[in-house]
Amino acid sequence: MSPVTEQWGEVLRTHLALGEDRPAVRAAATFSSEAGFFAAVGREGEDAWRYFRDVAPALQDEADGGNRGRDDVEALCTVCEETLHPRGLRLAGVDWRRESLERVTDAVTGTELYLALLRDGSRSMWVVRTRQGVCTFVLVDGETEGHATEARSLALDFDSFLAGQGY
């Protein structure tokens, strides 16, 4: 899959169980340093862009003359690094705090994945980065620890799928 294909949305929706009743995931998005955020899906067709960007991509492109540079790519690329960018991580007007960072070895491919837990008050989001630099942002639905644990598992499973696809 290329970052510009429309398949990403459906793949996210399927792998993160966004069509199920009471899913653990509220919204998810994929990001790369080359493309910025290039796919976002929400539960039950909800507009997921509002969780990851200040404005929708089409409006953003018009507003900045087609330059999709409004994602803070430099800062976003550090979310799964040892040291965060000094600006921190700001998504759609929310300053997220990184609570933890882990290196996880994918059981199927043996690929090393980087997993970060972000917090904004009682809200949480998992971010997993593949070796090829594709990041999956998974916003947990609600504040329960069970949903956070399930969303973590779904995020890792999805990135395992990406690693198997060569990402």
Predicted regions: what they are:
Residues M1-Y167:
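Non-catalytic interaction/Regulatory regions outside core domains
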